[in-house]
Design a protein with these regions (language model features):
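Hydrophobic beta-strand positions that form the internal "hydrophobic ladder"
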Residues: 171, 216, 257-261, 301-305, ...
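An edge-strand/N-cap motif at the start of beta-rich repeat modules
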Residues: 154, 164-189, 194
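Short beta-strand->alpha-helix linker/helix-N-cap micro-motif
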Residues: 26-91, 105, 109-111
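Amphipathic beta-strand/beta-sheet edge segments enriched in Tyr/Trp
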Residues: 21, 86-155
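Residue-level detector of Asp-centered blade-edge/turn motifs that repeat once per structural unit
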Residues: 165-167, 211-212, 255-256, 299-300, ...
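Short loop/turn segments that connect beta-strands within beta-propeller blades
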Residues: 126, 188-192, 232-236, 276-280, ...
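A flexible loop/linker signature enriched in serine peptidases of the S9 family
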Residues: 164, 175-183, 199-202, 219-228, ...
Length: 433
């Protein structure tokens, strides 16, 4: 699929400078922006209108999930796809103002033999102008339409906040929805039906992305021993990372993909080891009687966090990649696990045992920790690529589902239905345009 910006020569009255929103969503005094995502005007093949409606629906869902927007009911729209204009001069701003809409997104889609040309534009209702910085054209196949919607949502959020959104991303997780044992699944950010990636017929845990987003790690007990495997996203074949019968409980690629951190069990003692990308040991980083697991890299590649029982109960520690500079960074109670380092390096999220199990977000040095969940069972946080959101596994009414929240914990959205005990989420890196 190609990403092409709309030429300014095509535009009428426009506004290009964004009114950037500062601070976190749902902060004091914040208001969700009423937005209308109109089904696209379709031409060409018979499925064009349906694809145009799907684009609009996905875009609306993405923007509502962000917490910045409130999508309006399409039944209130005063313009219809087959008759609406696509410029500011042909947009009925008076009618749109009556619906309460502040922004309107509309456009056109042409489908010929499965090939799609799509144009989407955003209009500011109070100013009665088109927002030039947001208009986009896309070319691709019918199957690319969801990604076109995600990229449009990314562009709108970047216009609003100054930072690209997380919408054109994916989430790995483990689930039993395909049978009695868990496998690795993946779905797009908006919760489209998950796609099964593995068929292990064994216990599977701890999926983690390669920084390219093209492959992933996971731990399988297929040989009755936890071992680390890697698999390309488009493949059905996984290969072992470390040769021989070596027990590895979890692993994580470095930000540049050149190294791996793994929790390796040797003689009943689990420590953190540094490997090269081919699985060759480079260095043992921890050497303690306590259990050291769940390594997560800092974005700069010079530090990592992990969970250790060295103090007598699980806590989160940070260490330099050369094995020095050990310091504890978890201070919420006596039981803290599953660290996840934020993409910007300024925060670490982890699970704490408090009124069940809750998610904590703290500074990378452990200061300023706050709960982003309050009750129930909530575990295994993973950061969105923009660092504004997290996904975690939660127990809801006897089901295990994946839930998204902002980093302040002011909103929560369920992303899966819990059909198969959904756990161990891992949010992907950004996908390149």
């Amino acid at each position: 699929m190609r990403w092409v910006a709309v030429s300014l020569a095509c535009l009428g009255a426009v506004r290009s400078a964004p009114a950037v929103v500062s601070g976190d969503i749902y902060g004091p005094g914040s208001t969700q922006i009423p937005l209308a995502s109109v089904p696209l005007k379709g031409s060409g093949d018979a499925d064009a209108p349906a694809l145009g409606a799907r684009f609009a629906s996905i875009l609306a869902k993405d923007l509502e999930l962000s917490g910045y927007f409130k999508a309006l009911d399409p039944r209130s729209f005063p313009e219809r796809p087959d008759t609406m204009g696509l410029t500011a001069d042909t947009t009925d701003f008076t009618a749109w103002n009556a619906t309460g809409a502040q922004d309107v997104v509309k456009g056109a889609i042409t489908v010929n033999g499965g090939r799609v040309q799509l144009e989407a534009r955003m209009f500011d209702v109070p100013s009665q102008v088109e927002v030039s910085a947001v208009g986009r054209r896309f070319e691709g196949s019918a199957a690319d339409v969801p990604r076109m919607a995600h990229r449009m949502a990314d562009t709108i959020l970047e216009y609003l906040t100054g930072e690209r959104g997380p919408f054109d991303s994916q989430i790995l997780f483990t689930s039993r929805r395909g049978g009695p044992l868990k496998d690795v699944y993946v779905f797009d950010f908006d919760g489209d039906p998950p796609r099964r990636l593995t068929n292990e017929r064994a216990i599977v845990v701890a999926p983690r992305w390669h920084p390219s987003g093209d492959e992933f790690l996971f731990v399988s007990y297929r040989r009755h021993l936890p071992q680390l495997y890697r698999q390309a996203l488009g493949s059905r074949t996984a290969r072992s990372v470390v040769s021989g019968r070596v027990a590895i409980l979890n692993g994580a690629w470095s930000p540049d993909g050149s190294k791996l951190l793994v929790a390796r069990d040797v003689g009943g003692n689990t420590d953190i080891y540094l490997l090269d990308s081919a699985g060759k040991p480079l260095r043992r980083l921890t050497d303690h009687w306590g259990i050291d697991v769940s390594p997560t890299w800092a974005p700069d590649g010079r530090h990592f966090a992990f969970c250790s029982s060295r103090s007598g109960s699980p806590q989160i520690y940070v260490m330099d990649i050369d094995g020095g500079g050990l310091r504890r960074v978890s201070f919420h109670g006596s039981y803290n696990t599953s660290p996840a380092w934020a993409p910007k390096g300024d925060r670490i999220a982890y699970t704490t045992r408090q009124n069940g199990f809750q998610i904590v977000v703290a500074g990378a040095d452990g200061t300023g920790g706050r709960l982003v969940t309050r009750d129930g069972v909530n575990e295994d946080p993973s950061w969105a690529p923009d660092g504004r959101y997290l996904v975690f596994s939660a127990r809801r009414g006897g089901r295990r589902v994946l839930v998204m929240t902002d980093r302040e914990g002011r909103m929560q959205r369920e992303l899966t239905t819990g059909q198969g005990d959904d756990t161990s989420p891992a949010w992907s890196p950004r996908r390149d345009y």
